Amino acid sequence: MPSSGSGKAIGQLFESMSDNSFTCTVVNRGYKGGRDAHITVHNSKGSRHHFGDINYSWQSHSESNTSNGHVKVDADEYNMFLSLNDFMSSEKKRYDAKQVADVLWLEFTNQAGIEYD
């Protein structure tokens, strides 16, 4: 069920699209005319169209064959870890789930003009 904030400077709308996808919009009414940001996340399990294990797009209700980046489950001889690819960087870093969530959250909210100290 979608939830939304109302009457506040910051509003949000979360919507499940399927068992493997969701979309979310944040609106920052602190800007004249408002400023919004969108993200759609798809779990690529069983999909023909995927770039990684989890794909994300900076659009509302984007199709599973579009992506601004992806998260991939990787492993070495001893550990499993996540790799984050936004198509802009070839840097190979290892992330845990919280680190990936933090990176995506900051990018998502920055697009709506929301900054954290």
From Swiss-Prot:
Keywords: Plasmid. It comes from the Bacteria. This is Uncharacterized protein y4kM.
